[in-house]
Amino acid sequence: MAAGKTVGCFGLTEPDGGSDPGAMKTNAVRDGESYILNGRKMWITNGNIADVALVWAKNEEGRIKGFLVPTDTSGFKANKVDHKMSMRASVKSELVLDDVRVPATALLPEADGLSAPLSCLTQARYGIAWGALGALESVYDDALRFSKSRSTFDKPIAGRQLVQDKLVDMVADHTRGLLLAWRLGLMKDEGTMAYNHVSVAKRENVRSALKAARSAREILGGSGITLDYGVIRHM
């Protein structure tokens, strides 16, 4: 995967689990030198194009364990989720495991309990805290360019105080979010970053990006729902 030759996916979320991964129903039963996996995962990024899936399942003692499952293994099936109105650039899938047999060596030896997958999510959320700023910057750029070129009553709408207020809010939110993510990065390098710091940064920056996208769509008017601009992709 590091060389870009293999695609992987992270199988944690379940149809009835959502934000409660500890309630997962996917299970792994030891059978000699193998494990047999059964269950379903949902909203898995790259699921149907992956070569290998990291599947989280409960063993017979109820402990959450991680298993590396090649996607061509008998009993493994990935169904693409179509007809999405959002996240259209991201492949989402349902994973179905029906008596999927993997060797005991597929078990991640040091991953034990709910903290194992959650530690992975902390790293992902750190990236999202930064990525949301890119979305915010994109919708701001679209809104600024459009407001300068679009005129009403013989005046660019960028000169209207209401539009200016929306643009200033976007700049302020982006600046605040950038400082937050930058400080979080320093704490990460220092080893003082905690999972709650990451969760708050992700929450605040994603909230700011969504707010900016809604404001940008209002500034663009009807053009805001077209794919001529990137605003609607970030709603």
Q: How does the language model describe each region?
A:
Residues 11, 24, 40-42, 54, ...:
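Glycine-rich, charged/polar anion/phosphate-binding loops
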Residues 23, 72-101:
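Flexible, small-/acidic-enriched active-site or ligand-binding loops
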Residues 34, 40-78:
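A short core secondary-structure module
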Residues 16-25:
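Active-site-adjacent elements of ketosynthase-type condensing enzymes
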Residues 4-13:
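A short, Trp-centered hydrophobic/proline-enriched beta-strand micro-motif
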Residues 17-18, 42-48, 86, 123-127:
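Glycine-rich phosphate/pyrophosphate-binding beta-alpha loops
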Residues 4, 30-35, 94-96, 110, ...:
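Alpha-helical interface subdomain recognition
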Residues 19, 105-111:
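Cytochrome P450 core scaffold surrounding the K-helix E-X-X-R motif
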